[in-house]
Amino acid sequence: MSLWVDKYRPCSLGQLDYHKEQAAQLRNLVQCGDFPHLLVYGPSGAGKKTRIMCILRELYGVGVEKLRIEHQTITTPSKKKIEISTIASNYHLEVNPSDAGNSDRVVIQEMLKTVAQSQQLETSSQKDFKVVLLTEVDKLTKDAQHALRRTMEKYMSTCRLILCCNSTSKVIPPIRSRCLAVRVPAPSIEDICHVLSTVCKKEGLNLPPQLAHRLAEKSCRNLRKALLMCEACRVQQYPFTADQEIPETDWEVYLRETANAIVSQQTPQRLLEVRGRLYELLTHCIPPEIIMKGLLSELLHNCDGQLKGEVAQMAAYYEHRLQLGSKAIYHLEAFVAKFMALYKKFMEDGLEGMIF
């Protein structure tokens, strides 16, 4: 049994529920049988990957849905071996080079070279080029991005790149200038409510409009998250009620408890406990940027106006350090330690002011 988010994923540009004008423009783009390199960007859950797969379906037909998982070993110049997993069809290859860490440059060069020099197996839908889909391009190192820029020029005749990322701010200008940028905005609350109602109707369920609206708001306009929460509500309780509780993910609850622990006590022992909790989140593959953002959001609830500005500025500083460094736990712990010192001083100054 597949999840609703996969079961009802649109397969063609005509089936998309929102941003239909953009879908029509994308269809016109690929109808000629060719297109430039694309840079598709937008927030999580906006539908970037769905639109990319619809473009490939429009270009190559149903054969693009016959996917296989491949494991490849790439040897770096220093003789280090890197294991990388890819998803491929006869027409395209999907890879996340940032999985290779600091060796992402070698992965990009080898992958693009292999794809560009290989021939397609099915001649019925033969095109002059194959497509390489690179995800999380904004997480690539600068060396990898410069290598990508050189490689995309070299193999333009036999290979088209579709780059996918959340933000273009971390993509170097030479890559941005060589791609057609396609921004996929987050769906509106009304769009999400419409999709939730449509999916529930196909499942034979009656979804109250009030609950659909609450799900859309709680998901922060992330359609994937809204569908997953709706399915969780279905498992938890049916028939639906307008005021039923919407279950939260375990890591969100755990992060809130961690923030409460930071606020309740500021000692070296508590800092050690919080470090362990942060490690727990990282080992469960919660991205450090999400942890930082979630911690900041929860901690700001316990700060007054003056302190909020200082804490937000401090979080921005350590988030920047997080991007530059390779050990996330150092920067997360440094942020927590700095907040503890700032918050403790703020509370002590407040108590002194109350003593006449």
Curated annotation (Swiss-Prot):
GO terms for biological process: DNA repair; DNA-templated DNA replication; positive regulation of DNA-directed DNA polymerase activity. The keyword Ribosomal protein does not apply. Subunit of the replication factor C (RFC) complex which acts during elongation of primed DNA templates by DNA polymerases delta and epsilon, and is necessary for ATP-dependent loading of proliferating cell nuclear antigen (PCNA) onto primed DNA. Belongs to the activator 1 small subunits family. GO terms for cellular component: Ctf18 RFC-like complex; DNA replication factor C complex; nucleus. Subunit of the RFC complex, an heteropentameric complex consisting of a large subunit RFC1 and four small subunits RFC2, RFC3, RFC4 and RFC5; the RFC complex interacts with PCNA. Forms an heterotetrameric complex with RFC2, RFC4 and RFC5; this complex has ATPase activity but is not stimulated by PCNA. The heterotetramer of subunits RFC2, RFC3, RFC4 and RFC5 interacts with RAD17. Interacts with CNTD1; this interaction facilitates crossover formation. GO terms for molecular function: ATP hydrolysis activity; DNA binding. Gene3D superfamilies: 1.10.8.60, 1.20.272.10, P-loop containing nucleotide triphosphate hydrolases. The gene is RFC3. InterPro entries: AAA+_ATPase, DNA_pol3_clamp-load_cplx_C, DNA_Rep/Repair_Clamp_Loader, P-loop_NTPase. This is Replication factor C subunit 3.
